[in-house]
């Protein structure tokens, strides 16, 4: 075969692989209802922005919303304008972000360590439980994850090769991240650079030049600051207090919405977020000293450790905060796989099968034993959950034995990896199997279990033009599906209210219009007319 033919075949294989990966990210995107609170809040804010045509500000049920910057709402609104008001459109920006992040990681890994590492980086990014979940969630986190990947890669290119253009691209990505999520997009790379300056003396001059580059700061300012200036001019101190202080400073200094945790919180979350690949990270941890001698791996570990320590010190703790270390984790795991022993792969298989078994069998047991849950609201939801035979997918695992050879044959044919059969190729099929089952079976079950009452009541009253408030509940997806605002307050005379019915807290003379599981729609009586 001529070199040009070989290159053409190679590029075609990468195109096919990229399209297959896109299919994986789009798989089941519309199979699950929107999850409250986060997905409901983001999607309702986007819907209200489209209705008002006010593209510079968001509201939630008519109240100013300062939780996140404007960027994610723009992306969601564009997709909704194209594909309609549905779960697929709301989640599409996250899915595309996960896909592009995986491709960027694969491209870098291919140049750094070869074709096998490229496939590893892409599959790890696409199938690990945490990144997989974020790519199917209509929030800002997958978009921020994409920008963190691009920041991570271009930051290293700038340090390693002293590329001025790469440094300015970093400023662009940081600006976009700032527009999507806020100051954390700047804190993580700057914090990583400062620590790398301490441990890598050879790079100190380049780090200094990168941080003090006025052109890069200008790029950042042009991208990120116009909306912030507009928001401040429009809302004044309310924007400062609502966004910068409450949703940034207070998240670090105090616990918001009950999301606190022990200092060891992320030690528990870490192996769960990176299933089924967690054992490879544990092996990398054992080789930390060897990795530290490699400048790029040192950079990966410093990025990871900064994220881990910074958010461990924060009082508000959420699992997805650890995903800000995503690009570093993907490369650490990919590199570890290149040198993994047979024993390491056996442990990886065992831990992955254990994790997948719990994820698949958990719903069946919770359905059969809802008394395991103490919260009466969630206990009632589980009691009304759909019957599931999900555990049958555990017994389908042997199918991997038949699917794996076809996957290996594709890799050989495409010349993406060398011709030698590697143990990791067999494990790819388990990772893909996990994504398939979770996307098409497990996640839809959880969405019906947790969200069906709110969704079905919203659809029941969608054509009803009367005001329906949320009283004693916070389920913003109810407003998204009903396509009408649903303020959180006590109902006024004659208004309807979405309430929890486990322990009724409304007066006995109120009319109950509909009941679905632990939720009801009730109507407050009109003000009685008095005789003159």
Protein language model regions, located:
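Membrane-integral, polyisoprenol-dependent glycosyltransferases
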Residues: 1-344, 363, 514-522
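Membrane-embedded architecture of ER/inner-membrane glycosylation machinery
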Residues: 2, 10, 168, 287-532
């Amino acid at each position: 075969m001529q070199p040009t033919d070989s290159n053409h075949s190679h590029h075609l294989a990468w195109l096919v692989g990229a399209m297959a990966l896109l299919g994986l990210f789009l798989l089941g995107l519309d199979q699950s209802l929107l999850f409250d609170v986060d997905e409901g809040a983001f999607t309702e804010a986007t819907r209200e922005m489209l209705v008002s045509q006010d593209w510079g500000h968001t509201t939630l049920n008519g109240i100013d919303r300062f939780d996140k910057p404007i960027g994610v709402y723009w992306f969601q609104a564009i997709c909704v304008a194209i594909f309609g008001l549905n779960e697929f459109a709301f989640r599409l920006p996250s899915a595309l972000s996960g896909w592009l992040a995986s491709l960027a990681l694969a491209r870098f890994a291919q140049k750094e360590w070869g074709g096998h590492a490229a496939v590893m980086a892409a599959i790890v990014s696409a199938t690990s439980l945490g990144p997989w979940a974020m790519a199917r969630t209509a929030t800002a986190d997958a978009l921020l994850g994409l920008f963190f990947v691009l920041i991570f890669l271009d930051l290293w290119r700038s340090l390693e090769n002293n590329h001025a253009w790469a440094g300015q691209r970093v400023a662009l990505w940081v600006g976009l991240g700032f527009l999507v999520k806020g100051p954390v997009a700047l804190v993580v790379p700057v914090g990583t650079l400062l620590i790398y300056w301490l441990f890598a003396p050879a790079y100190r001059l380049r780090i200094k030049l990168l941080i003090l580059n006025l052109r890069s700061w200008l790029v950042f300012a042009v991208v990120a600051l116009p909306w912030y200036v507009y928001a401040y001019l429009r809302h004044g101190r309310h924007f400062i207090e609502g966004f910068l202080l409450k949703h940034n400073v207070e998240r670090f200094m105090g616990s918001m919405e009950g999301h606190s945790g022990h200092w060891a919180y992320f030690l528990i979350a870490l192996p769960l977020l990176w299933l089924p690949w967690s054992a490879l990270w544990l092996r990398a941890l054992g080789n930390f000293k060897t990795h530290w001698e490699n400048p790029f791996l040192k950079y990966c570990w410093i990025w990871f450790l900064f994220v881990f320590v910074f958010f461990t010190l924060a009082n508000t703790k959420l699992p997805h905060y650890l995903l800000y270390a995503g690009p570093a984790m993907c490369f650490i795991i990919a590199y570890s796989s290149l040198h993994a022993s047979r024993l390491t792969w056996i442990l990886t298989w065992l831990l992955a099968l254990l994790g997948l078994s719990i994820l698949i069998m958990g719903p069946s047991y919770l359905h059969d034993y809802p008394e395991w849950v103490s919260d009466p609201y969630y206990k009632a939801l589980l009691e009304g959950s759909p019957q599931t035979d999900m555990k049958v997918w555990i017994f389908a695992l042997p199918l991997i034995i038949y699917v794996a050879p076809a996957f290996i044959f594709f890799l050989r044919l495409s010349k993406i990896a060398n011709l030698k059969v590697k143990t990791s190729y067999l494990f790819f099929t388990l990772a893909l199997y996990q994504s398939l089952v979770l996307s098409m079976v497990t996640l839809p079950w959880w969405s019906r279990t947790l969200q069906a009452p709110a969704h079905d009541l919203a659809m029941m009253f969608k054509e009803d033009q009367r005001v329906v408030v949320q009283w004693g509940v916070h389920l913003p997806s109810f407003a998204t599906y009903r396509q009408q605002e649903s303020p959180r307050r006590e109902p006024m005379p004659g208004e309807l209210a979405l309430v929890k019915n486990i322990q009724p807290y409304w007066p006995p003379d109120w009319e109950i219009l509909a009941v679905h599981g632990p939720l009801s729609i009730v109507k407050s009586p009109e003000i009685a007319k008095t005789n003159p």
